[in-house]
Amino acid sequence: MAAFSVHILGCGSALPTTHHHPSSQVIDLRDKLYMIDCGEGVQRQFRHEKLHFGRLIHIFISHLHGDHCFGLPGFISTLGLLGRTGTLHVHGPEGIERFLSPILEQFCHRMPYQVEIHTIDASRHALVHEDKSVKVYSIPLSHRIPAVGYLFEEKCRARHLNKAAAEFYNIPLAEYPLIIEGSDYTTPDGRIIPNRHLTTPGTPPRRYAYCSDTEFCPSIVPIIQGVDLLYHEATFMEEDRARAKETFHSTAKEAAEIARQAGAKRLLIGHYSGRYKDVQGLLEEAQSVFKPTIAANERMRIDL
């Protein structure tokens, strides 16, 4: 089975702490890396995880609060120093171009590669990127400024060849790749053997949803229904719910309720407020509602 894993580079919130880095994750899917959010310190975390800079082609920014995007200027500059030549694509909500363009002009105008900026309508659920491995959809979130989550949906994987059937019909080996991709087979005498008689369905595609930052927002549930893994911010505990409401963030219990309603297979919480020195309370609060909950931590890798 092809790799589909999530690397946690940072899971803290706005205020810097000695125990968590600002938000950033990297998805490793087949032959590519996809970054979600790019807080300060991301370059060191990227190296700690032994991730290859050259495999990263797309960066997705959730919103323009500093703890989610202040790592971008340094990261973009470093890629140039490393001799990158392939285009880097940066996706984000309205304002992403105003944020990046002056930086690119001032510090990165002689780089050996191009940066393409793609503005996303944070109010719409839409397909924002597609390649041979994945489709990426926007998830409208509810925060103090335009914020967007991301749903990564693996492309349908190839069907499994029924070797006994292939041998029965004397199908040449050269035809196997086409059959695995879904083609019927025509025998030398002109008979058409339907693909369903020659293959079985491939493994269901895996799905990962990233939802941060946002207040409790049940409207996202239909979009993320049945995901294999849901990352949902859990900035506060229920005892600080008033502060969560004031700042348009979620509690751990609310994150778990979203996971429960969506029928997610697993929940990953993060974006912890700096007031909590230990995240065990946040984890237990979430698990009281949705048992298969994991507390994110730096340098953690979760396989889907």
UniProtKB/Swiss-Prot annotation:
CDD domains: RNaseZ_ZiPD-like_MBL-fold. Gene3D superfamilies: Ribonuclease Z/Hydroxyacylglutathione hydrolase-like (3.60.15.10). Its EC number is 3.1.26.11. Its cofactor is Zn(2+). It comes from the Bacteria. It catalyses: Endonucleolytic cleavage of RNA, removing extra 3' nucleotides from tRNA precursor, generating 3' termini of tRNAs. A 3'-hydroxy group is left at the tRNA terminus and a 5'-phosphoryl group is left at the trailer molecule. SUPFAM superfamilies: Metallo-hydrolase/oxidoreductase. GO terms for molecular function: 3'-tRNA processing endoribonuclease activity; zinc ion binding. The active site is at D67 (proton acceptor). The keyword ATP-binding does not apply. Binds 2 Zn(2+) ions. Zn(2+) 2 binds at D67, H68, D213, H271. It holds the Pfam family Lactamase_B_2. Keywords: Endonuclease, Hydrolase, Metal-binding, Nuclease, tRNA processing, Zinc. Zn(2+) 1 binds at H63, H65, H143, D213. Zinc phosphodiesterase, which displays some tRNA 3'-processing endonuclease activity. Probably involved in tRNA maturation, by removing a 3'-trailer from precursor tRNA. PANTHER family: ZINC PHOSPHODIESTERASE ELAC PROTEIN 1 (PTHR46018:SF2). Homodimer. Belongs to the RNase Z family. HAMAP family: RNase_Z_BN. This is Ribonuclease Z. It comes from Porphyromonas gingivalis (strain ATCC BAA-308 / W83). The gene is rnz.
